[in-house]
Amino acid sequence: VDQILAAYPKDLRFVYKQMPLTQIHQNAMNASKAAVAAGKQGKGWEMHDELFKISSNLSLDEIKKVAVKLGLDMAKFDADMNSPETDKLIQDDLAVARATNVNGTPTFFINGKLVSNRSFEGMKAMVDEALNNAKPSK
């Protein structure tokens, strides 16, 4: 993802949707809530990356240790993690996943089309096609 975003810094907008796979990972919902809460303090990606590193142990205690490590305001983090707004955002993201038949992560779309070849070359071809189709003809 970083490589394709770097190749098209002015042409792409990356949108991340939460999709906690709670049927597979018992702590997935808390991890999603933590990423959303950290994002409200400008550290969403950092939280995501740190949680990915400890994905085998995503207990609430471990998640909070990561929040402390990232220097988050813990009162705000706890409030945001448990807020109805965070729950709604995640439920809305899950609704989008259901509506688009997404059932696993990661899943990528470029201009509404499912990316089947997630290599840099595959994504680049789809981005180039979308950009060519978006340009007005002369």
Residue ranges and their predicted role:
Residues V1-L5, K64-K138:
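C-terminal cap of thioredoxin/glutaredoxin-like
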